[in-house]
Amino acid sequence: MVSPSSQVTGYNGSVSFTVSPNSGFKAELATNTCGGTLSGNTYRVSNVTSNKTCSITFKSTPTLYTKLLADKTTRPGARTSFSSVLTTDNTKTLYTSTENGITVYYFAGNATDNWVKFGKNSSGADLFWRIIRTNSDGGIRLLYHGTSTTATDAYIGTSAFNSSASNIAYVSYMYGSLGSIANARENTNNSTIKTTIDNWYTSNLEAKGYTKYLSTTAVYCNDRSTSDNTYFGAYTRLNTNKTPSYDCTDTNDKFTVDTSTGNGKLTYPIALMTADEVSFAGGVFVKNAETWYYKNSANGSSTGSTFWWLLSPNDWSGSYAHVFGVNGSYSPGNLDYNGVFFAYGVRPAISLKSCVKTSGGDGSANAPYTILDTETGC
């Protein structure tokens, strides 16, 4: 938009116009045929000695995915060993892996520049998140960090994973009838923790109009694969083999809103971080790990002393169902597990759509990435 559309000046004079970019563009010049200058929304052409027709274009606003890859220029590649914790301080660093054969990028160690400010809670307070990784759909996966980068209560509340631990089905985010994993994979009943998360979502992100920014194709893996009806897939990968994976084998364990990429059982595009994602980020089973998912920007525990739930089943002992989680300050960042009937911290995970644009920031705690407000989310 340009105002006015034309100006008259004397020989060697100057003219100014008020210009504003359309949605999806920012007030920075991409092309500029008259060699003018832009300050804020004022475009100025000096030393005019003849009639001129001027044309300018603005730079497009980058997607968060594009900005993330442009900013994080250190690329160590794929990690080859997950037997030791990774807690090294780092910035501008992205590691690589794959999800469904597609390259994805993730933060590991004590990354200090994976902060995002996105959304508001029901009280109108800004919400802060940590970037976990990119998804195979090009989206950006985030972990909840409350209303401050220095939060020591970065969870939406406490909840049991399920109200009882007395059946193998209770390792499930959703389950069908009881008695077996095959029955559990019918996915007709919400877990206790899913109800907690969904209720928070409707009162906060949905109520404030932020659903349009979130991916419905992102997969949240509640991996219930088991060869012996005792230990589940994540336990074997992370305790026995030390080989985390972003892949989710069984469609019934792929919790999604959209049926094109998973089971389509989610009503809302929100769930939890997985134990495999913690391992990629630098955690190791039953070892302390003061990595980015544990720390706040003041280098303290994001959840104080509170243990918080992950999405990954650990084991069925024959009488108790156990699910993975992360310990608070009494055993810092330790990837552990607990009986599902205990009430522990709930830190939701969401995924921004691949087309979501950033309005600024560099990912640091002082300048977190911010999201451009748009009508469609893109």
Model-based region annotation:
Residues G13-R44:
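Surface-exposed interfaces of beta-sheet-rich extracellular modules
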Residues N41-T61:
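Conserved "repeat-terminator" motif of extracellular CCP/Sushi domains
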Residues M1-N12, K26:
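Conserved N-terminal submotifs of small, disulfide-stabilized extracellular modules
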Residues S6, T42, T53-S55, F128, ...:
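Well-ordered beta-strand positions in beta-sheet-rich domains
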Residues V8-N12, L38, N47-T49, F341:
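Surface-exposed coil/turn segments at beta-strand junctions on protein surfaces, enriched
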Residues S60-C378:
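Long, domain-scale functional regions
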Residues V15-V19, N51-F58, I350:
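Append "Rare intracellular matches occur via the same short Y/T/C beta-strand/loop motifs
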Residues V2-P4, T42, N334:
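Short structured motifs
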